[in-house]
């Protein structure tokens, strides 16, 4: 027995050999369902047919005709390109927590990045920094990395509300341009049709930097002979 999909949106079962499901389909997780539930039911699991008669099911298709694909599993480049060519107007939301080290590597790379724009805040780093960027840098459509609902203490930036990281599809060659986007702004754009708002350096980031300074470890007080030795080092003649 294998999973089968039909015109209805509930998964059911069929004997092998009669499978008519989308070949791009991946097993749905709680992460998929949580994302889809942000959108009206009649936007979810929208069925499309290719000219060759293949059936494809878009995760979400908005009333403005934009397809949102929520990608958890690894995706081959040829399959990604096929989907982008088929749907044209689409964006990707990628689960940044699929592999244990993806998140930590991504945020570690941000500590080596340079800021190329203040409003919206945009970072630039080499496009080969970590598997996530290598896998998605060649996408012709916007990619949003989802690293969960909360910041973690080791993150270079701490936000108090869920944030997605947008990979700019027109990044210069060899570079990846990334911008933090509030999840509420993302949903306002694709549910309500409002403009996507990035995070400006002057307002939100200033508060973030203040929070980072408060959490920075303070120097340990000198004990024992350490004050004496420190004074001697300061007085040591230099040639």
List each model region and its residues.
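Hydrophobic beta-strand segments of well-ordered beta-sheets in folded domains
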Residues: 65-66, 88-92, 142
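Basic, amphipathic alpha-helical patches used to engage nucleic acids or provide basic targeting signals
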Residues: 75-97
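DNA- and nucleic-acid-binding/regulatory domain cores of transcription factors and nucleic-acid enzymes
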Residues: 19-22, 26, 30-32
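Cysteine-rich micro-motifs
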Residues: 7-21
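Short, glycine/acidic-enriched capping/hinge loops at junctions between secondary-structure elements
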Residues: 5-6, 25
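Non-catalytic C-terminal interaction segments of nucleic acid-processing enzymes
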Residues: 97-239
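Short, structured patches in soluble enzyme cores that scaffold and shape functional sites
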Residues: 70-72, 94-96, 147
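Active-site metal-binding core of divalent-cation-utilizing nuclease and nuclease-like domains
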Residues: 1-4, 31-82, 105-109, 131-136, ...
């Amino acid at each position: 027995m294998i999973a089968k999909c039909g015109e209805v949106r509930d998964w059911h079962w069929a004997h092998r050999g009669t499978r008519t499901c989308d070949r791009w389909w991946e097993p749905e997780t709680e992460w998929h369902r949580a994302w889809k539930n942000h959108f009206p039911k009649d936007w979810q699991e929208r069925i499309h047919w290719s000219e060759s008669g293949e059936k494809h099911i878009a995760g979400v298709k908005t009333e403005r005709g934009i397809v949102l694909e929520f990608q958890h599993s690894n995706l081959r480049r040829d399959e990604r390109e096929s989907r982008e060519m088929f749907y044209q107007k689409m964006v990707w939301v990628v689960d940044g927590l699929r592999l244990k080290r993806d998140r930590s590597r991504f945020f570690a790379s941000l500590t080596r990045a340079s800021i190329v724009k203040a409003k919206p805040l945009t970072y630039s780093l080499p496009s080969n920094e970590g598997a996530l960027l290598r896998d998605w840098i060649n996408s012709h459509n916007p990619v949003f990395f989802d690293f969960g609902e909360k910041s973690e203490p080791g993150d270079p930036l701490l936000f108090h509300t869920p944030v997605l990281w947008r990979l700019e599809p027109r990044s210069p060659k060899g570079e990846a341009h990334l911008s933090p986007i509030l999840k509420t702004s993302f949903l306002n754009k694709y549910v309500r049709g409002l403009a996507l708002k990035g995070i400006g350096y002057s307002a939100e980031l200033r508060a973030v930097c203040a929070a980072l300074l408060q959490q920075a470890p303070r120097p340990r007080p000198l004990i024992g002979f350490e004050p004496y030795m420190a004074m001697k080092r300061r007085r040591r003649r230099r040639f």
